A protein has these predicted regions:
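A composition-biased, non-transmembrane "mature-region" signal
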Residues: 1-216
């Protein structure tokens, strides 16, 4: 199951690193320094946009990627899932991200990203319950146990912008929905990014200074 690509600048030399979605132990190809990526909460990613000069509004989507195993009378079956859902109460926005996470490169979200971020009201528990509900079950087929294995849950932000009372997709620049031209419809759901942190932990041995090795 394909994940998405992430662009990140090396905290040591500033060189561009191209990462996989699940990479946590990363090595810079320029300076060779290795770091372990850590976030206190969910990892947050933003999609790049094609609307320079516009005031971007980032809409949150909660995404699950993993395998759903079901234990039935006939045996154990599994289903690979890549599932995203809109995290705000604005139901006129796209309901899911579709294949965009796999098709577009992303960056980690943080205080350095210009624009306004909306709060995510959907919880991880809500998303996992929906993933379970979406798993097909044959009529009169009893499921004794269901497990989600290797799951990765993260937040992905879709960039939008408003112009003349219309909200546009900032990737395709196509209109999505009309919004009031006066007033701020997003003021009550704006999120604070002051606590968003992507932490780089050095992988050098604290005693001898040698590089520690590990899986990505």
């Amino acid at each position: 199951m394909a994940g998405f690509k992430v662009e990140q600048d090396c905290p040591q030399c500033g060189g561009r690193m191209n990462l996989e979605e699940t990479d946590r132990l990363v090595a810079c190809t320029y300076c060779g320094v290795k770091n372990f990526l850590y976030s206190p909460g969910l990892f947050r990613f933003v999609m790049g946009h094609n609307a320079p000069g516009k005031e971007i509004v980032y809409v949150p989507y909660l995404r699950f990627k993993g395998t759903v195993f079901s234990c039935r009378i006939q045996g154990v079956s599994h289903r690979i899932v890549d599932f995203s859902r809109l995290g705000t109460p604005f139901r006129n926005f796209p309901f899911s991200l579709g294949l965009r996470p796999q098709a577009l490169k992303m960056r980690f979200a943080g205080p350095d990203i210009q624009g306004r971020f909306l709060k995510c009201f959907l919880t991880s528990s809500d998303l996992l319950e929906e993933v379970t509900r979406q798993t097909p079950v044959e009529r009169d087929d009893s499921v004794f146990h269901r497990a989600l294995i290797g799951e990765a849950i993260n937040l992905i932000y879709l960039p939008l912008y408003g112009e003349k009372g219309i909200l546009f997709d900032a990737i395709t620049n196509k209109p999505i929905v009309r919004i009031p031209e006066k007033g701020d419809v997003f003021s009550t759901v704006a999120d604070s990014r002051s606590v968003w942190r992507l932490i780089f932990l050095s992988t050098l041995c604290p005693k001898c200074g040698w590089n520690l090795e590990g899986e990505r």
